[in-house]
Amino acid sequence: KVIPVVEKYTELPLILDYAEKVGVRPTIGMRVKLAARGGGRWQSSGGYRSKFGLTVGEILKGLEELKARGMEDCLQLLHFHLGSQIPNIRIVKGALNEAARVYVELSRLGAGLKYMDVGGGLGVDYDGSQTNFESSVNYTLQEYANDVVYHLQTVCDEANVPHPTIISESGRAVVAHHSLLVFNVLGVSG
């Protein structure tokens, strides 16, 4: 299933116009700029001042546009991205709480949300120190997964909103432990 994610408000009318042209009801996602910022080397790629994503106000405006077209059920995914290699689990927890509250409010306003994309950020403990420095993380994969589920579930339960299907973009954590060294053979012996 392909879900186009709106990262700039000007993309929404393009998606809606094209969907109308080809006669489909699109499944749409929106990337929210959270107030929470990531940590570590790539922290500027997330947060409210990020060049990617929509403010909460823009998302609400987008939902109103969808409602005007009778398409609020088409908004099915909320996405956020803190950055890459988030070293401190507290940052992740804060962002999860904020994003979950946006998810709940959009659901209450009539969005057909089913998915929460928690983006990237799952870090790798490169130096083995288990600290919140750039080359490490102060959490395990299991702790990260538990926190994602717990925080989304708790906020949704408090608001009596169905739990979302969780999507993650944890590319670094998937590939970091697998590497390959490629080089030219300079000579052969024997």
What are these regions (language model features)?
Residues 1-117, 124, 140-143:
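Active-site-proximal beta-alpha core segment in soluble small-molecule metabolic enzymes
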Residues 84-190:
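C-terminal active-site-proximal or functional interface alpha/beta core segments in diverse enzymes
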